[in-house]
């Protein structure tokens, strides 16, 4: 499939009044994590936090796959970014408690809640949009790909150009999903869905890090993933503050009207495009984001 990036929307139901019209902001995520009680919330007590994490069999299987991969690479220190509810990180710690695990988020309320409920790990405030990588053997980007636009991600990979990364994708866009997203856009035009970032095709993912990293596609249990290795070999790690000179690739974007299937074909024929889309978690088997 060609390089395609589409805007993603999510219907939070009654929680939309708490989240607002755009999820991809630290204050919106904080409200969703600490002011709601649904699947996205971080439980307020340690007991509830553990109970919630242990109940996620899907995440447990994914964590085992990631743990095995980390062990195969001898990773003693792992930094996981934008962890949110941190169910995956709880499983990673349970599976390998001697491995140092640093978890980060850019919502201050989320960070505070994690400090209170997940004392076994190191919790740090970190904003991927501007901060340098932390000191770690491997840097884990687990289901945070929807959070940033293409140009923002290219800037992230430029700052992380000297470090190895494991990218575990929220979802990889294929033609079937693209058609479904665009059809749903018409049906939900008048609904109050919240902007929830972007979803991408495999080619669009790989274009983000091509200037800075080589990549190898792998499968982490239920999700498509990539192992990224720095192109710059034998130079100072970017976690030590070295500046970079990589030039981000330009981002091209096209807006569509209420889309028909013919629109999709037109966009695909034109090559790398960003198009508008709308999805809902309870229709058509669409992906529900992990908390």
Residue ranges and their predicted role:
Residues 139-140:
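A conserved beta-strand element that flanks and buttresses the S-adenosyl-L-methionine
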Residues 143-144:
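Short catalytic micro-motifs in class I SAM-dependent methyltransferases
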Residues 147-160:
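A short, conserved alpha-helix within the catalytic core of class I
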Residues 290-291:
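Short, intrinsically disordered, low-complexity terminal/loop segments
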